Amino acid sequence: MNPSHDLQGLKKKAKETFLYVLSALLLGIAIGAIDAVFGRVLLFITDFRSAHVVVLLPFLPLAGLGIVWLYRHFNETASKGMTLVMEAGQGKRESIPLALIPLVMAGTWITHLFGGSAGREGVAVQIGATLSHAFARRFHFPDNGRIVLIAGMAAGFGGLFQTPFAAVFFAMEVVVSGSMAYSALLPAAIASFTASATSHALGLEKFSVLLSQTLSLTDTKTVTYLILFGILFGLTGRLFAVLLQKVKQFMGNVLENPYKRIGFVSIPLAVFLFLGLSLIHISEPTRHLRISY
């Protein structure tokens, strides 16, 4: 053994760890701030839509066409969304366009405003991944910045939902299915908790649900049910992912034009949703609600 060689190795490792920690802190603050803006605007839009749903819902098809136009006009590559993140994490892509951040935020805001359904977790992860990957490329981190990318994904998820523990493990396992990127644990944890604290400090509301019942993990029956439900939920998630991929491929083959594709789906959807609004008036839980026209 060479003591001087070992010492140099320790110094190199300490320097590397320090850089990852510092990067995680900076990214956590930046991504948490973006999450706060995105989340607060989304909450405002949701309240506004709820108060004017009858007026806004018929314009859902036009909103969809507008979103397609935005991507095609400004950066069509960004329309791949999470696929870009996965490819970057697996080393199959050199960069993620920064245009993805404003486009995915605007697309989600528009979708929610006109009554469409768009998840927030994907947006949060894409925001964090895009910013962190650009940061990693700018400062030439090793392994195509994979650790920094994972930290950014954790920051995006943790900043929007303020669930830092869940964000860390989600980011560590989502890039490569079936494996955990343990080397990214420390940077991901720091970035996630920093982003969560930042978005909270900037006034982003955290959703909380109080549970009146507790589960006993010493009860064999309860544990058996939990295992069965876990298997069922996993299979359901797998089925959904496969069907989603197949439907996208099918629609892409049948209707290659994205404008026709969005119209084919959104126009009937808007009609059915609009006609279904009358059910709100006769449903027991909401019969006293007033809908603004």
Specify the residue positions occupied by each region the protein language model found.
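Hydrophobic alpha-helical segments, chiefly the membrane-spanning helices
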Residues: S292-Y293
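Alpha-helical transmembrane segments and immediately membrane-proximal extracytoplasmic
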Residues: M1-S283, R287-L289
